């Protein structure tokens, strides 16, 4: 099975197929002592560390009786870690030897997408069919399987950029689920927090543009296991080791995943991690606009770092802000030079205009406009990083799939390597240019996973796009 692959940089792992607890043995020069496990694969098995030290030999590895989930379900209703006694008392005494690069945990759903085969197939079609590419978009002859899901894409892109990432979610125990986990293992993404569901199938999304109304339609197998991850199935070992907890707004569409998400956020804050909210707003997935704003606002107030697009920001603010940006007069309409100095050729929302969305926990807000501009806001300064225009989509050469995920992965990569970027505006802009370069390369290549760049390629493009003083 794909979930049983072991990487050499892992000392221990939690398997979803083998639910026995794993004891971590630490050697010292004076003596050998056994420590209690940090957390079992089902969330139970948390014991007192002092009692384990007095034991002369480890306990048997027999299957233990599963504890009740009354305490863990109570965690789902709590939003403040200080009010939860289990969060305050939890301490397994285990330290992680790998601190560089820090681990990033990506929480959410991983799916199999079926996209037109003319983009992803290894054997391209006849060259004469290139002239009919416009019609192939409306009526593709075949569909090919492609890994999808923003959390898994961000995890893979983060590893490509030189970081360490772990995916936390659930898949079905079928061919699709095995293939997705195997794909992440091949990309060196840790999958010890992945759960397998025997009673449901992995979600499959069939993407096709309907010629009738020109809208994107998605057919999904329900109920997928991605929407049924419970709080008792969280891997606390991964949450403790991760320095950044990343999640996407799509998990808010499932009531079960909502409670599990906020429980995971509580644990991550308890362990000192940063909360990264990647807003993804396909409105057809939501029931109503008011419910969308309400759920996003709840997750928004828990996040330390947020990434949104310009259209998503205007949706959360109000339609009046869209009209203000639309009526903005650029600098090339200025009547004299003094007006040119005070105007820009684009609209940048001021901190006063986004004041209604700001809260005390928020450290960084990034507003993307494709790869053309990245607007950033911190409690002390704000500004814009200029990139390049989005590429033109052509057959068999490039697409924009996964570009936003690459930008998010680039931001998280620099957050782990340069924590002081919150304090210096010049350092902030230099690090965000790296994220812009990652998004540009993802646009230039076909597909999401195949198009994610490496750290060296991203740095090389950054040095080509910007002058040396901006590196």
Swiss-Prot record:
Listed PANTHER family: FRUCTOKINASE-LIKE 1, CHLOROPLASTIC, HEXOKINASE FAMILY MEMBER
Comp. bias (Polar residues): 39-57
Gene that encodes the chain: FLN1
SUPFAM superfamilies in the record: Ribokinase-like (SSF53613)
Record Gene3D superfamilies: 3.40.1190.20
Record GO terms (molecular function): kinase activity
Family: Belongs to the carbohydrate kinase PfkB family.
Organism: Arabidopsis thaliana (Mouse-ear cress)
Subunit structure: Interacts with CITRX/TRXz. Interacts with PTAC7. Self-interacts. Binds to FLN2. Associates with the plastid-encoded RNA polymerase (PEP) complex.
Protein name per its UniProtKB record: Fructokinase-like 1, chloroplastic
Note from the entry: RNAi plants display abnormal plastids lacking internal membrane structures.
